[in-house]
Amino acid sequence: YFAGQNSITKSIKSKQETFNSHYNGTKNFLKILKKKKLNTKFFKANSGYIFSPKNGLINLKCNFSSNKNPYIQTQQKVFDLIKKFRKYNLNLSNLIFLQIESPLRSNDFFIKKVCLGAKNKKKIIVGNMNTFRDYSWITEIVKAILLTSNLKTKDYIISAGSNISGKDIIKEAYKLNGLNYKKYVSINKKFFRKEEIKSLIGSKRNTSYLRNKHNFKFKIFGHKLIKEMYKNLGTKP
């Protein structure tokens, strides 16, 4: 189940939509699986933001975040819901992701927004540039999901396990077009998130099973991911 309102910012004004699309949507599926006694494998996509990192890293042993954001709180409830229904011998897994990037993302998602600004030589306004996040490329995430689908039922955190700062993303994107980002980027504190975590990275141990069982490693992350996004975007008319 990969549907749902996935914007942390938009969830503040769309609390009910966020809850319905994630919690109620998931629960409807689980009730049917339980009633029909189906052994269908069911994955629920979730977010690393539900956890409070230890030394900037997250794993499944981390405590839940105390952040009051509606999206984060909803996904925490969904995480527990999956674990609760798994007790009925259902084949259920939480798949925890960090940032997943794709050129099909909405234009307001950070990396795509920055790359479009750079490619079109346009000025952009951003929030906190001094946070570090773990960005993964969509094609590699899909492959990792397929490999994970053959493994035993439990919860997984899937990410590249590498960090890059917002500032480095901006510098790299504008550099690809021969531009000095300082002339094009301004900061507005209204885009700063409440209770912003400085560093949110998935531990590389989270995906050791992919390396050990399938010899799979993430290759597109950091500066290479920025180049991939930039390359795959056209310029706006």
What are these regions (language model features)?
Residues 112, 118-237:
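C-terminal substrate-binding subdomain of Rossmann-fold SDR/epimerase-dehydratase oxidoreductases
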Residues 1-20:
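NAD(P)H-binding glycine-rich loop region in Rossmannoid oxidoreductase-like domains
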Residues 3, 43-46, 53, 68, ...:
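Active-site beta-alpha turn of Rossmann-fold NAD(P)-dependent dehydrogenases/reductases
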Residues 53-55, 66-93, 115-120:
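Active-site Tyr-X1-5-Lys
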Residues 50-52, 66-70, 93-113, 132:
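Flexible, glycine-rich beta-alpha linker
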Residues 1, 27-70:
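Conserved Rossmann-fold NAD(P)-dependent oxidoreductase catalytic core, especially the SDR/UDP-sugar
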Residues 26, 30, 79-83, 142-145, ...:
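Short-chain dehydrogenase/reductase
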